[in-house]
Structures are given as structure tokens and as C-alpha cells.
Amino acid sequence: MSDPLRLRRAEATEPGVRALIAAQLAHGAEAAPETNDYTYGVAALSAPQVTIWALADSDTVAAIGALCDLGDGMAEVKSVHVAAAYRGQGLARRLMQHLHEAARAAGHRALVLETGSEALPGYDAARALYRGLGYGPCGVLPGYRDDPASAFFRLELA
């Protein structure tokens, strides 16, 4: 790593971002049933209602996360993923805290997200992170199925 990681806006088509999207898609394919994989690919993350942030140095994108504006004061957290070489350094928490700030600045009153349920151990760290940040369980989100492999969370923004 040549310099400290900085948070910046990113595009889904950037090579480093694309690499993390591919890694997240591979994780979803391995950790979740095919019928329960809601991971966004490059096209979905390029939609106008989606904003992506990256933690990166001049050479490497270490982590990504996105907000999808759902309207009515709500946004969905999407595609939070940390490259394997950077895990265990608190980058997901740092990125999530930035997403909270960005959502507040955009006028959102709440954030929602979907992740794998307790039935999918590959998502244990994600659930622990979200709970630790104050997210609580909520009902099924629009566009999702009621599925025992999904866990839905909501955070009211102050």
C-alpha cells in the first residue's frame, strides 16, 4: 500500500471497484442460495439512484459501499464489501459510518438493508456489524421475498 486509504465517490465501472463487485458476487454465489442472492452487479450499481463510495489508496480499492435512494426519505445500503487483504481493520465500520453521514446529508430519515440470515454463516460478520451500528430487524423490504435466508434491518437516522 503506497499511501493511506481515503474515502471517495466511485463509479461501478472503475477497474478496482469492478473487482470488488466481482468478489462480492462470488461470495454471494458461494454463501447464499441462488434464489436468495440480491447482490448488485455493475449495471445495477450504475443506476442514477445509486451512489458508490470507495476506501482506496492510489493503487488499490480496499472497500466499497453504496446507497440506493428509495424515495420518501429512505435509502438502502447496498454492496458493502471489503477486499480480503484488508479485512479486520475496521474498514466496513468506517465505510458504514460514512454512508450514515451521506444519507443524513441527502435528507434521508432511515436506512434499510438486506443480508444473509442466521441460516447463512457466511454473513455472521455483516449481521454483527449492522447490529453494532444500531440497526434493528424490520419487515421484508420492497423488491425482496420473505425468505428464511434473508435478514432485513433498519436504522432510523437522527
What do these predicted regions represent?
Residues A103-E118:
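Conserved GNAT acetyl-CoA-binding A-motif
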Residues R93, E118-V140, D146-P148:
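Conserved active-site alpha-helix within GNAT-family acetyltransferase domains
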Residues Q89, R104, G122-L129, A149-A158:
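Accessory recognition modules or surfaces
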Residues V80, A85, E114-E118:
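Short strand-loop junctions, especially beta-strand C-caps/beta-turns
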